[in-house]
């Protein structure tokens, strides 16, 4: 019996957990976005 891979891609889960709205919904998430803006990231979130 082989063990399954841990990464099972799903766009819905990706957006719900790491999307812009998810980041904006918490204070810490907004800190993440602020850091990424300061760094000059082209993409702020998933």
UniProtKB/Swiss-Prot annotation:
Gene Ontology biological process terms in this record: translation
Source organism, top-level taxon: Bacteria
Alphabetical keyword list: Ribonucleoprotein, Ribosomal protein
Record-level GO cellular component terms: ribonucleoprotein complex; ribosome
Keyword Transmembrane helix: no
Pfam families documented for this protein: Ribosomal_L34
The keyword Ribosomal protein is assigned to this record: yes
Biased composition (Polar residues): 1-11
Stretches for region Disordered: 1-46
GO molecular function: structural constituent of ribosome
Compositionally biased region (Basic residues): 32-46
Cystine bridges: none
PANTHER family reported for this sequence: LARGE RIBOSOMAL SUBUNIT PROTEIN BL34M, MITOCHONDRIAL RIBOSOMAL PROTEIN 34 FAMILY MEMBER
HAMAP family: Ribosomal_bL34
Family: Belongs to the bacterial ribosomal protein bL34 family.
Protein name per UniProt: Large ribosomal subunit protein bL34
Organism name: Xylella fastidiosa (strain Temecula1 / ATCC 700964)
Lineage per the UniProt record: Bacteria, Pseudomonadati, Pseudomonadota, Gammaproteobacteria, Lysobacterales
Gene name linked to the record: rpmH
């Amino acid at each position: 019996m082989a063990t399954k891979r841990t990464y099972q891609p799903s766009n819905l889960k990706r957006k719900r957990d790491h999307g812009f709205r998810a980041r904006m919904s918490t204070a810490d998430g907004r800190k993440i976005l602020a850091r990424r803006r300061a760094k000059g990231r082209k993409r702020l979130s998933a």
